[in-house]
Amino acid sequence: MDWAEATGAHSWSKLYDRYYRKQQMYRLAWGDEIDLAKMKVAGAPFAGPVALLRDSSKISMVTASTLRNSLNIYSAAGVLLAEIPWKKGKVVDMGWTEKEKLVVVLDDGSVLLYSVDGRLVQSFNLGDEFKVDRVLQACIWKSGVVCLSRAYALVYVDDFAEPLPRRMPRLQEPEAPPTCMAIIPPELAPSKGLEVLLAIGKTILTVDVAGITDQKLTAGPLRCISVCPNGKMLACFTHDGFVWVITTDFSKNLSEFPTKSQVPPQQLVWCGTDSVVLYWDKMVLMVGPYGDWVKHSYDEPLRLLPEVDGVRIISNTLQEFLHRVPEATVDVFKIGSCSAGAMLVDALDQLERNDGRAHDTIRAIREMDGNGLQTAVDTCLAAAAHEYDVPLQQMLLRAAAYGSSFLQRRSPLLMESTTTLLRALNAVRESAIGLPITKTQLERLTPAAMVERLAQRNHHYLALQLCQWLQLDARPVVVHWACQRILSGGSVSDDQLHREINERLKAVTDLGLPSHSAGVAMSVSRAEMAATALQEVLAPPARTQRRAMLI
Protein backbone atom coordinates (compact mmCIF):
# COMPACT_ATOMS: atom_id res chain seq x y z
CA MET A 1 0.00 0.00 0.00
CA ASP A 2 1.17 3.55 -0.72
CA TRP A 3 1.37 4.87 2.83
CA ALA A 4 2.74 8.20 1.61
CA GLU A 5 -0.56 8.80 -0.17
CA ALA A 6 -2.63 7.54 2.77
CA THR A 7 -0.84 9.88 5.20
CA GLY A 8 -0.68 12.84 2.84
CA ALA A 9 3.13 12.76 2.87
CA HIS A 10 3.09 13.92 -0.76
CA SER A 11 1.66 17.24 0.43
CA TRP A 12 4.10 17.80 3.29
CA SER A 13 6.11 21.00 3.01
CA LYS A 14 9.84 20.89 3.75
CA LEU A 15 11.40 23.96 5.32
CA TYR A 16 15.14 23.31 5.63
CA ASP A 17 15.27 19.90 7.40
CA ARG A 18 11.77 20.03 8.90
CA TYR A 19 8.47 18.87 7.49
CA TYR A 20 5.13 20.62 8.00
CA ARG A 21 1.62 19.51 7.16
CA LYS A 22 -1.86 20.96 7.16
CA GLN A 23 -4.69 18.68 8.33
CA GLN A 24 -8.42 19.28 8.23
CA MET A 25 -10.02 18.90 11.64
CA TYR A 26 -13.66 19.84 11.13
CA ARG A 27 -16.14 21.15 8.65
CA LEU A 28 -17.57 23.83 10.91
CA ALA A 29 -21.14 23.39 12.11
CA TRP A 30 -22.02 27.09 12.24
CA GLY A 31 -23.14 27.03 8.61
CA ASP A 32 -23.32 30.05 6.32
CA GLU A 33 -24.14 32.63 8.99
CA ILE A 34 -20.52 33.48 9.83
CA ASP A 35 -18.31 35.87 7.88
CA LEU A 36 -14.97 36.06 9.68
CA ALA A 37 -14.01 39.16 7.70
CA LYS A 38 -16.57 41.09 9.76
CA MET A 39 -15.73 39.52 13.13
CA LYS A 40 -13.51 39.93 16.14
CA VAL A 41 -12.19 36.45 16.90
CA ALA A 42 -10.56 34.96 20.00
CA GLY A 43 -9.58 31.31 20.20
CA ALA A 44 -8.78 29.56 23.47
CA PRO A 45 -5.47 27.66 23.51
CA PHE A 46 -5.25 23.88 23.70
CA ALA A 47 -7.90 23.38 20.99
CA GLY A 48 -10.41 25.39 23.00
CA PRO A 49 -13.58 27.27 22.02
CA VAL A 50 -13.76 30.27 19.71
CA ALA A 51 -15.48 33.56 20.59
CA LEU A 52 -16.95 35.70 17.79
CA LEU A 53 -18.30 39.24 17.97
CA ARG A 54 -19.25 41.48 15.07
CA ASP A 55 -16.54 44.10 14.56
CA SER A 56 -18.26 47.49 14.70
CA SER A 57 -15.42 49.07 12.70
CA LYS A 58 -16.21 46.86 9.67
CA ILE A 59 -18.95 47.71 7.21
CA SER A 60 -21.66 45.03 7.22
CA MET A 61 -24.81 44.51 5.19
CA VAL A 62 -27.87 45.21 7.33
CA THR A 63 -29.60 41.90 8.06
CA ALA A 64 -31.58 40.43 10.93
CA SER A 65 -28.37 38.92 12.36
CA THR A 66 -26.38 42.18 12.21
CA LEU A 67 -29.18 44.11 13.91
CA ARG A 68 -29.12 41.56 16.73
CA ASN A 69 -25.49 41.83 17.83
CA SER A 70 -24.31 39.06 20.14
CA LEU A 71 -21.09 37.62 21.51
CA ASN A 72 -21.14 33.96 20.53
CA ILE A 73 -18.97 31.17 21.88
CA TYR A 74 -18.49 28.10 19.68
CA SER A 75 -16.66 24.84 20.14
CA ALA A 76 -13.71 24.19 17.84
CA ALA A 77 -16.14 22.24 15.65
CA GLY A 78 -18.40 25.28 15.25
CA VAL A 79 -21.14 24.10 17.64
CA LEU A 80 -22.77 27.00 19.49
CA LEU A 81 -22.02 26.85 23.22
CA ALA A 82 -23.34 30.25 24.30
CA GLU A 83 -25.00 33.36 22.87
CA ILE A 84 -24.60 36.58 24.86
CA PRO A 85 -26.65 39.61 23.72
CA TRP A 86 -24.06 42.37 23.45
CA LYS A 87 -24.86 45.85 24.75
CA LYS A 88 -21.85 46.33 27.02
CA GLY A 89 -19.81 48.77 24.95
CA LYS A 90 -16.92 48.93 22.51
CA VAL A 91 -14.62 45.90 22.64
CA VAL A 92 -10.88 46.54 22.31
CA ASP A 93 -9.64 42.96 22.68
CA MET A 94 -10.73 39.45 23.63
CA GLY A 95 -8.74 36.49 24.94
CA TRP A 96 -8.88 33.44 27.19
CA THR A 97 -7.53 32.52 30.61
CA GLU A 98 -5.82 29.26 31.53
CA LYS A 99 -9.12 28.20 33.16
CA GLU A 100 -10.91 28.72 29.81
CA LYS A 101 -12.73 31.89 30.81
CA LEU A 102 -13.36 34.43 28.04
CA VAL A 103 -11.82 37.84 28.80
CA VAL A 104 -13.39 40.90 27.14
CA VAL A 105 -11.67 44.30 27.45
CA LEU A 106 -13.81 47.39 26.81
CA ASP A 107 -12.51 50.80 25.84
CA ASP A 108 -13.56 52.31 29.20
CA GLY A 109 -11.18 49.98 31.07
CA SER A 110 -13.83 47.45 32.06
CA VAL A 111 -12.75 43.80 32.00
CA LEU A 112 -15.45 41.09 31.81
CA LEU A 113 -14.91 37.35 32.26
CA TYR A 114 -17.41 34.80 30.92
CA SER A 115 -17.66 31.05 31.31
CA VAL A 116 -17.94 28.86 28.21
CA ASP A 117 -21.69 28.63 28.77
CA GLY A 118 -22.03 32.43 28.62
CA ARG A 119 -22.34 33.33 32.32
CA LEU A 120 -20.67 36.53 33.50
CA VAL A 121 -18.44 35.19 36.28
CA GLN A 122 -16.32 38.26 37.05
CA SER A 123 -15.96 41.94 36.19
CA PHE A 124 -13.67 44.76 37.29
CA ASN A 125 -12.31 48.08 36.05
CA LEU A 126 -8.69 49.08 35.56
CA GLY A 127 -9.24 52.66 36.69
CA ASP A 128 -11.21 55.84 36.17
CA GLU A 129 -8.60 57.31 33.83
CA PHE A 130 -9.72 54.95 31.07
CA LYS A 131 -13.20 56.47 31.19
CA VAL A 132 -11.61 59.68 29.89
CA ASP A 133 -8.52 58.56 27.98
CA ARG A 134 -9.96 55.23 26.80
CA VAL A 135 -8.03 52.05 26.02
CA LEU A 136 -5.80 52.34 22.98
CA GLN A 137 -4.41 48.78 22.93
CA ALA A 138 -4.63 45.73 25.19
CA CYS A 139 -2.92 42.36 25.56
CA ILE A 140 -4.34 39.35 27.39
CA TRP A 141 -2.44 36.35 28.68
CA LYS A 142 -3.48 33.26 30.62
CA SER A 143 -3.62 34.95 34.03
CA GLY A 144 -3.80 38.68 33.36
CA VAL A 145 -4.34 41.70 31.13
CA VAL A 146 -2.49 44.94 30.39
CA CYS A 147 -3.98 48.06 28.76
CA LEU A 148 -2.40 51.13 27.21
CA SER A 149 -4.45 54.33 27.44
CA ARG A 150 -4.54 57.10 24.86
CA ALA A 151 -2.54 59.15 27.37
CA TYR A 152 0.14 56.40 27.24
CA ALA A 153 -0.45 55.04 30.72
CA LEU A 154 0.06 51.29 31.19
CA VAL A 155 -2.12 49.51 33.76
CA TYR A 156 -2.13 45.76 34.32
CA VAL A 157 -3.63 42.97 36.40
CA ASP A 158 -1.43 39.89 36.69
CA ASP A 159 -3.87 37.60 38.51
CA PHE A 160 -7.55 37.41 37.63
CA ALA A 161 -8.19 35.69 40.96
CA GLU A 162 -7.16 38.94 42.72
CA PRO A 163 -7.69 41.71 40.13
CA LEU A 164 -5.64 44.51 41.68
CA PRO A 165 -4.73 47.11 38.99
CA ARG A 166 -1.06 48.08 39.01
CA ARG A 167 0.66 50.85 37.09
CA MET A 168 3.76 50.68 34.98
CA PRO A 169 5.90 53.72 34.14
CA ARG A 170 4.03 56.21 31.94
CA LEU A 171 5.47 56.84 28.49
CA GLN A 172 6.51 60.31 27.48
CA GLU A 173 4.14 61.29 24.71
CA PRO A 174 5.73 60.01 21.48
CA GLU A 175 5.53 61.70 18.10
CA ALA A 176 3.18 58.95 16.90
CA PRO A 177 1.14 56.27 18.71
CA PRO A 178 2.63 52.76 19.04
CA THR A 179 2.09 50.78 15.86
CA CYS A 180 1.81 47.48 17.75
CA MET A 181 2.13 45.96 21.18
CA ALA A 182 3.08 42.55 22.60
CA ILE A 183 3.94 41.10 25.98
CA ILE A 184 6.31 38.60 27.55
CA PRO A 185 4.25 36.97 30.33
CA PRO A 186 5.78 36.88 33.81
CA GLU A 187 6.40 33.13 33.71
CA LEU A 188 8.51 33.53 30.53
CA ALA A 189 10.26 36.82 31.27
CA PRO A 190 13.84 36.72 32.67
CA SER A 191 12.77 39.21 35.34
CA LYS A 192 9.79 36.99 36.30
CA GLY A 193 7.62 40.07 35.90
CA LEU A 194 5.43 41.31 33.06
CA GLU A 195 7.32 42.91 30.17
CA VAL A 196 5.47 45.02 27.59
CA LEU A 197 6.97 45.57 24.13
CA LEU A 198 5.83 48.71 22.30
CA ALA A 199 6.85 49.42 18.70
CA ILE A 200 7.21 53.20 18.50
CA GLY A 201 8.89 54.97 15.61
CA LYS A 202 11.96 53.03 14.49
CA THR A 203 12.52 51.25 17.79
CA ILE A 204 10.92 49.08 20.45
CA LEU A 205 10.43 50.15 24.05
CA THR A 206 10.54 47.45 26.73
CA VAL A 207 8.46 48.45 29.75
CA ASP A 208 8.38 46.70 33.12
CA VAL A 209 7.73 47.87 36.67
CA ALA A 210 11.38 48.94 36.97
CA GLY A 211 11.34 51.35 34.05
CA ILE A 212 11.39 51.90 30.29
CA THR A 213 14.24 50.67 28.08
CA ASP A 214 14.76 51.92 24.54
CA GLN A 215 16.24 49.03 22.55
CA LYS A 216 17.80 51.49 20.04
CA LEU A 217 16.55 49.68 16.96
CA THR A 218 16.58 51.25 13.51
CA ALA A 219 14.46 48.80 11.50
CA GLY A 220 11.11 50.44 12.27
CA PRO A 221 8.42 51.37 11.94
CA LEU A 222 7.37 47.82 12.79
CA ARG A 223 3.86 46.92 11.63
CA CYS A 224 3.40 43.64 13.57
CA ILE A 225 5.28 41.91 16.38
CA SER A 226 4.75 38.48 17.94
CA VAL A 227 6.51 36.77 20.85
CA CYS A 228 7.49 33.11 20.50
CA PRO A 229 5.64 30.64 22.78
CA ASN A 230 8.83 30.09 24.79
CA GLY A 231 9.32 33.85 25.22
CA LYS A 232 12.85 33.80 23.77
CA MET A 233 12.28 35.15 20.24
CA LEU A 234 10.40 38.04 18.67
CA ALA A 235 9.08 38.05 15.10
CA CYS A 236 8.58 41.47 13.49
CA PHE A 237 7.15 42.68 10.20
CA THR A 238 9.00 45.80 9.11
CA HIS A 239 7.69 48.76 7.12
CA ASP A 240 9.67 47.62 4.07
CA GLY A 241 8.25 44.08 4.04
CA PHE A 242 10.82 42.01 5.93
CA VAL A 243 10.04 39.29 8.44
CA TRP A 244 12.70 39.94 11.06
CA VAL A 245 13.35 37.52 13.94
CA ILE A 246 15.44 38.59 16.93
CA THR A 247 15.91 37.41 20.49
CA THR A 248 13.68 39.07 23.08
CA ASP A 249 16.75 40.39 24.89
CA PHE A 250 17.59 42.12 21.57
CA SER A 251 21.15 40.76 21.58
CA LYS A 252 20.95 38.63 18.42
CA ASN A 253 19.56 39.04 14.93
CA LEU A 254 18.40 35.53 14.00
CA SER A 255 16.95 35.88 10.50
CA GLU A 256 15.52 38.24 7.89
CA PHE A 257 13.16 37.25 5.12
CA PRO A 258 11.93 39.60 2.35
CA THR A 259 8.23 39.10 1.65
CA LYS A 260 8.27 41.72 -1.14
CA SER A 261 5.05 43.13 0.29
CA GLN A 262 4.90 46.47 2.03
CA VAL A 263 1.27 45.82 2.94
CA PRO A 264 1.34 44.50 6.52
CA PRO A 265 -0.28 41.13 7.17
CA GLN A 266 -3.54 40.94 9.05
CA GLN A 267 -1.90 38.48 11.46
CA LEU A 268 1.62 37.39 12.39
CA VAL A 269 1.86 34.36 14.70
CA TRP A 270 4.32 31.63 15.61
CA CYS A 271 3.93 28.00 14.51
CA GLY A 272 5.48 26.31 17.51
CA THR A 273 9.01 27.65 18.00
CA ASP A 274 10.38 26.86 14.52
CA SER A 275 8.57 29.11 12.08
CA VAL A 276 6.26 32.09 11.73
CA VAL A 277 2.97 32.29 9.84
CA LEU A 278 1.59 35.45 8.21
CA TYR A 279 -1.91 35.99 6.87
CA TRP A 280 -2.89 38.38 4.12
CA ASP A 281 -6.25 38.36 2.40
CA LYS A 282 -6.55 34.96 0.67
CA MET A 283 -2.96 33.92 1.43
CA VAL A 284 -1.07 32.27 4.30
CA LEU A 285 2.73 32.39 4.23
CA MET A 286 4.91 30.21 6.46
CA VAL A 287 8.57 31.22 6.86
CA GLY A 288 11.09 28.76 8.31
CA PRO A 289 14.22 29.44 10.34
CA TYR A 290 16.62 29.43 7.37
CA GLY A 291 14.60 31.44 4.88
CA ASP A 292 12.63 28.57 3.36
CA TRP A 293 8.95 29.32 2.87
CA VAL A 294 5.67 27.85 1.70
CA LYS A 295 2.46 29.56 0.61
CA HIS A 296 -1.15 28.40 1.00
CA SER A 297 -3.95 30.08 -0.96
CA TYR A 298 -7.54 30.47 0.23
CA ASP A 299 -10.71 31.91 -1.28
CA GLU A 300 -12.35 32.94 2.01
CA PRO A 301 -11.36 34.97 5.08
CA LEU A 302 -9.34 33.28 7.83
CA ARG A 303 -8.13 33.67 11.38
CA LEU A 304 -4.93 32.16 12.76
CA LEU A 305 -5.13 30.73 16.28
CA PRO A 306 -1.65 29.88 17.60
CA GLU A 307 -1.04 26.76 19.67
CA VAL A 308 2.06 25.49 21.47
CA ASP A 309 2.78 23.07 18.61
CA GLY A 310 1.21 24.71 15.58
CA VAL A 311 -1.50 27.03 14.28
CA ARG A 312 -5.22 26.43 13.98
CA ILE A 313 -6.59 27.97 10.78
CA ILE A 314 -10.31 28.70 10.85
CA SER A 315 -12.26 29.89 7.84
CA ASN A 316 -15.97 30.38 7.27
CA THR A 317 -16.33 26.66 6.59
CA LEU A 318 -13.31 24.69 7.88
CA GLN A 319 -10.88 24.33 10.73
CA GLU A 320 -7.39 23.09 9.85
CA PHE A 321 -4.20 22.52 11.83
CA LEU A 322 -0.83 23.60 10.44
CA HIS A 323 2.05 22.08 12.35
CA ARG A 324 5.44 20.45 12.21
CA VAL A 325 5.24 16.75 11.40
CA PRO A 326 6.38 14.76 14.47
CA GLU A 327 9.75 13.03 14.12
CA ALA A 328 8.25 9.56 14.57
CA THR A 329 5.73 10.23 11.78
CA VAL A 330 8.49 11.44 9.47
CA ASP A 331 10.54 8.37 10.35
CA VAL A 332 7.72 6.01 9.36
CA PHE A 333 5.99 7.76 6.47
CA LYS A 334 8.55 9.99 4.75
CA ILE A 335 8.73 9.11 1.06
CA GLY A 336 11.58 6.65 0.54
CA SER A 337 12.12 6.03 4.26
CA CYS A 338 14.05 2.83 5.04
CA SER A 339 13.95 3.24 8.82
CA ALA A 340 13.07 0.37 11.14
CA GLY A 341 9.61 1.86 11.74
CA ALA A 342 8.90 2.18 8.01
CA MET A 343 10.04 -1.41 7.41
CA LEU A 344 7.79 -2.69 10.22
CA VAL A 345 4.80 -1.00 8.56
CA ASP A 346 5.82 -2.68 5.29
CA ALA A 347 6.03 -6.02 7.09
CA LEU A 348 2.49 -5.58 8.41
CA ASP A 349 1.24 -4.72 4.92
CA GLN A 350 2.89 -7.87 3.55
CA LEU A 351 1.38 -9.97 6.34
CA GLU A 352 -2.13 -8.65 5.70
CA ARG A 353 -1.70 -9.45 1.99
CA ASN A 354 -0.52 -12.99 2.86
CA ASP A 355 2.87 -12.17 1.38
CA GLY A 356 5.54 -14.60 2.57
CA ARG A 357 8.17 -11.85 2.56
CA ALA A 358 6.79 -10.41 5.81
CA HIS A 359 9.02 -12.68 7.90
CA ASP A 360 12.03 -11.73 5.77
CA THR A 361 11.32 -8.06 6.45
CA ILE A 362 11.20 -8.73 10.20
CA ARG A 363 14.54 -10.54 9.94
CA ALA A 364 16.01 -7.57 8.07
CA ILE A 365 14.84 -5.19 10.83
CA ARG A 366 16.50 -7.40 13.44
CA GLU A 367 19.75 -7.33 11.49
CA MET A 368 19.80 -3.51 11.25
CA ASP A 369 21.25 -3.26 14.76
CA GLY A 370 20.92 -5.05 18.04
CA ASN A 371 17.79 -3.12 19.06
CA GLY A 372 16.22 -2.51 15.66
CA LEU A 373 12.93 -4.29 16.26
CA GLN A 374 12.32 -2.60 19.62
CA THR A 375 13.10 0.75 18.00
CA ALA A 376 10.61 0.00 15.22
CA VAL A 377 7.87 -0.88 17.73
CA ASP A 378 8.51 2.24 19.80
CA THR A 379 8.52 4.44 16.69
CA CYS A 380 5.19 3.07 15.47
CA LEU A 381 3.63 3.65 18.89
CA ALA A 382 4.97 7.21 19.02
CA ALA A 383 3.66 7.92 15.51
CA ALA A 384 0.25 6.51 16.45
CA ALA A 385 0.04 8.76 19.52
CA HIS A 386 0.62 11.86 17.35
CA GLU A 387 -1.73 10.80 14.54
CA TYR A 388 -5.16 12.40 14.07
CA ASP A 389 -6.55 9.92 11.54
CA VAL A 390 -8.12 6.93 13.33
CA PRO A 391 -7.48 4.30 10.58
CA LEU A 392 -3.80 5.29 10.56
CA GLN A 393 -3.70 5.03 14.36
CA GLN A 394 -5.12 1.52 14.13
CA MET A 395 -2.65 0.49 11.42
CA LEU A 396 0.33 1.77 13.44
CA LEU A 397 -0.89 -0.04 16.55
CA ARG A 398 -1.25 -3.27 14.55
CA ALA A 399 2.29 -2.82 13.23
CA ALA A 400 3.60 -2.30 16.76
CA ALA A 401 1.71 -5.37 18.00
CA TYR A 402 3.06 -7.45 15.10
CA GLY A 403 6.62 -6.36 15.82
CA SER A 404 6.19 -6.99 19.54
CA SER A 405 5.30 -10.62 18.87
CA PHE A 406 8.90 -11.22 17.76
CA LEU A 407 10.50 -9.61 20.81
CA GLN A 408 11.98 -11.90 23.43
CA ARG A 409 11.23 -9.43 26.22
CA ARG A 410 7.84 -7.87 25.67
CA SER A 411 6.80 -4.80 27.64
CA PRO A 412 3.07 -4.22 27.17
CA LEU A 413 3.01 -1.03 29.26
CA LEU A 414 3.83 1.34 26.39
CA MET A 415 1.27 -0.31 24.12
CA GLU A 416 -1.36 -0.11 26.86
CA SER A 417 -0.65 3.54 27.69
CA THR A 418 -0.68 4.52 24.00
CA THR A 419 -4.01 2.84 23.29
CA THR A 420 -5.53 4.38 26.42
CA LEU A 421 -4.27 7.82 25.40
CA LEU A 422 -5.69 7.44 21.89
CA ARG A 423 -9.01 6.28 23.27
CA ALA A 424 -9.23 9.47 25.31
CA LEU A 425 -8.03 11.75 22.49
CA ASN A 426 -10.41 10.26 19.93
CA ALA A 427 -13.34 10.62 22.33
CA VAL A 428 -12.82 14.34 22.88
CA ARG A 429 -12.08 14.98 19.19
CA GLU A 430 -15.57 13.88 18.13
CA SER A 431 -17.37 16.83 16.54
CA ALA A 432 -20.11 16.68 19.19
CA ILE A 433 -17.43 17.44 21.80
CA GLY A 434 -15.19 19.59 19.59
CA LEU A 435 -11.85 19.38 21.39
CA PRO A 436 -9.25 18.51 18.70
CA ILE A 437 -6.34 18.44 21.14
CA THR A 438 -2.98 16.92 20.18
CA LYS A 439 -0.72 14.74 22.31
CA THR A 440 1.77 17.60 22.69
CA GLN A 441 -0.96 20.00 23.79
CA LEU A 442 -2.38 17.45 26.24
CA GLU A 443 1.03 16.96 27.83
CA ARG A 444 1.32 20.73 28.35
CA LEU A 445 -2.29 21.16 29.52
CA THR A 446 -2.41 17.93 31.63
CA PRO A 447 -5.22 15.33 31.50
CA ALA A 448 -6.74 16.63 34.74
CA ALA A 449 -7.19 20.09 33.20
CA MET A 450 -8.78 18.57 30.09
CA VAL A 451 -11.26 16.69 32.29
CA GLU A 452 -12.05 19.93 34.10
CA ARG A 453 -12.79 21.63 30.77
CA LEU A 454 -15.12 18.81 29.76
CA ALA A 455 -17.00 19.21 33.03
CA GLN A 456 -17.31 22.95 32.47
CA ARG A 457 -19.01 22.20 29.15
CA ASN A 458 -21.36 19.80 30.97
CA HIS A 459 -19.86 16.68 29.35
CA HIS A 460 -19.82 15.01 32.77
CA TYR A 461 -20.31 11.45 31.55
CA LEU A 462 -17.35 11.66 29.17
CA ALA A 463 -15.28 13.39 31.86
CA LEU A 464 -15.96 10.49 34.23
CA GLN A 465 -15.02 7.99 31.53
CA LEU A 466 -11.70 9.77 31.05
CA CYS A 467 -11.11 9.70 34.80
CA GLN A 468 -11.58 5.93 34.69
CA TRP A 469 -9.38 5.40 31.62
CA LEU A 470 -6.58 7.72 32.74
CA GLN A 471 -6.84 6.85 36.46
CA LEU A 472 -7.71 10.38 37.56
CA ASP A 473 -9.62 11.58 40.61
CA ALA A 474 -13.31 11.78 39.65
CA ARG A 475 -14.38 13.91 42.61
CA PRO A 476 -13.98 17.32 40.88
CA VAL A 477 -16.27 16.12 38.06
CA VAL A 478 -18.87 14.85 40.50
CA VAL A 479 -18.77 18.07 42.51
CA HIS A 480 -19.21 20.17 39.37
CA TRP A 481 -22.13 18.02 38.21
CA ALA A 482 -23.85 18.34 41.60
CA CYS A 483 -23.54 22.13 41.56
CA GLN A 484 -24.81 22.35 37.99
CA ARG A 485 -27.76 20.12 38.86
CA ILE A 486 -28.68 22.45 41.72
CA LEU A 487 -28.49 25.48 39.41
CA SER A 488 -30.73 23.78 36.83
CA GLY A 489 -33.15 22.24 39.34
CA GLY A 490 -36.11 24.25 38.10
CA SER A 491 -39.37 23.52 39.92
CA VAL A 492 -38.11 20.34 41.61
CA SER A 493 -38.45 20.54 45.41
CA ASP A 494 -35.38 20.82 47.63
CA ASP A 495 -35.97 17.41 49.16
CA GLN A 496 -36.53 15.66 45.83
CA LEU A 497 -33.47 17.33 44.28
CA HIS A 498 -31.36 16.40 47.30
CA ARG A 499 -32.39 12.74 47.04
CA GLU A 500 -31.73 12.66 43.30
CA ILE A 501 -28.24 14.11 43.66
CA ASN A 502 -27.34 11.84 46.57
CA GLU A 503 -28.43 8.74 44.65
CA ARG A 504 -26.18 9.67 41.74
CA LEU A 505 -23.28 10.52 44.04
CA LYS A 506 -23.58 7.19 45.83
CA ALA A 507 -23.32 5.42 42.47
CA VAL A 508 -20.00 7.09 41.71
CA THR A 509 -18.16 7.95 44.90
CA ASP A 510 -18.42 8.12 48.68
CA LEU A 511 -18.99 11.88 48.56
CA GLY A 512 -22.09 13.56 49.86
CA LEU A 513 -23.13 17.02 48.76
CA PRO A 514 -19.95 19.12 48.47
CA SER A 515 -19.56 21.90 51.03
CA HIS A 516 -19.65 24.76 48.55
CA SER A 517 -22.91 23.41 47.12
CA ALA A 518 -24.54 25.18 50.07
CA GLY A 519 -23.53 28.52 48.57
CA VAL A 520 -24.74 27.40 45.15
CA ALA A 521 -28.08 26.37 46.66
CA MET A 522 -28.44 29.72 48.44
CA SER A 523 -27.72 31.57 45.18
CA VAL A 524 -30.89 30.03 43.70
CA SER A 525 -32.95 30.43 46.90
CA ARG A 526 -32.80 26.81 48.04
CA ALA A 527 -32.27 27.44 51.75
CA GLU A 528 -33.42 23.97 52.84
CA MET A 529 -30.92 22.25 50.53
CA ALA A 530 -28.15 24.59 51.68
CA ALA A 531 -28.84 23.68 55.31
CA THR A 532 -28.86 19.97 54.46
CA ALA A 533 -25.53 20.26 52.63
CA LEU A 534 -23.91 21.96 55.62
CA GLN A 535 -25.28 19.29 57.97
CA GLU A 536 -23.80 16.53 55.80
CA VAL A 537 -20.42 18.24 55.80
CA LEU A 538 -20.42 18.44 59.60
CA ALA A 539 -21.63 14.85 60.05
CA PRO A 540 -20.93 12.88 56.85
CA PRO A 541 -22.65 9.49 56.75
CA ALA A 542 -20.69 6.38 55.85
CA ARG A 543 -20.92 5.47 52.20
CA THR A 544 -19.68 2.58 50.17
CA GLN A 545 -17.76 3.56 47.06
CA ARG A 546 -18.87 1.75 43.93
CA ARG A 547 -17.47 1.99 40.44
CA ALA A 548 -20.27 3.30 38.24
CA MET A 549 -21.12 6.18 35.99
CA LEU A 550 -23.53 9.09 36.04
CA ILE A 551 -26.23 8.64 33.44
Language model: regions and residue ranges:
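Extended non-globular scaffold/tether segments
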Residues: 2, 8-26, 30, 253-260, ...
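WD40-like beta-propeller blades
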Residues: 1-275, 279-308, 324-345
